[in-house]
Amino acid sequence: MKQLVGLGVKEIVYVQPRRGFAGISLSWLCNKYSIDLTLVMPSSKEISDHQALCIELGAKPLFARIAAMPNANRLARLYAEKTNAYFVPLGLNHPFVIAGGVKCFYDFFKDKEKPKTMWSVISTGVLTRTMQIALPDTNFKAVAVARNIQQGELGVAEFYSYHKPFNSKSDLVPSDFDCEDSYDSKGWDYLNKYGNKDDWFFSVAGNARKPNIEKKLVNSYRDWNDLKDFKQYGI
């Protein structure tokens, strides 16, 4: 984020699904560094807790009815082109993020025995590919929880697809550490079913705090092809 400040970035645009920690993290960081944040969000009758928390932390929401998050990603890119905002792709698939992640993993394990096997969930694949760069001799297991995996996203990880829909809770939720019950917990469940006792598990985040804003007061519903939130920007 400091690099973006140094580049003179005044506004970032990203996407925020109903569940996802990247938008929450960006909302907090943009607040800290006095950068405006715009988040393209899928239309719904009522925003989710994660989306509400982003708005509470200062993010400007733009709503559109979409079939899948790549459609929101396209709108975010168009918004950036029209407004000169700094576009960050879905999944934080950005060189600064990947480089920072590689350094964090490398530094953490440089004086430790490297894991033989590392489990994580996968959506866009940025996390597992980042760990694969930092830990080239580790075997990776990736549990898909949210979307169809595209070519190149998996890296060299062994692929698993969780047997329940994205918004459903995991069959097993960790009891000894905080873990989001419909996301990372699904990776934990499969580690316990198919992994070994010495396997490592990377959890993206614990449960986010509950937002304080009144969710029903946010007008988030849009019909198909209703892009009124974007018209003022020439989209």
Question: Residue spans of the language-model regions?
Answer:
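Structural beta-sheet core signal
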Residues: 39, 120, 142, 201-203
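Gly/Ser/Thr-rich loops at beta-strand to alpha-helix junctions
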Residues: 16-24, 44-45, 94, 120-131, ...
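Active-site/ligand-binding loops adjacent to catalytic centers
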Residues: 137-195, 216-235
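Active-site-proximal loop->helix
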Residues: 3, 21-67, 133, 150-156
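Small/polar-residue-rich loop-to-helix segments that shape phosphate-bearing ligand pockets
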Residues: 43-112, 155-179
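Internal active-site segments that recognize and position negatively charged phosphoryl groups
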Residues: 101-112, 117-129
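Positively charged, low-complexity intrinsically disordered leader regions
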Residues: 1-10
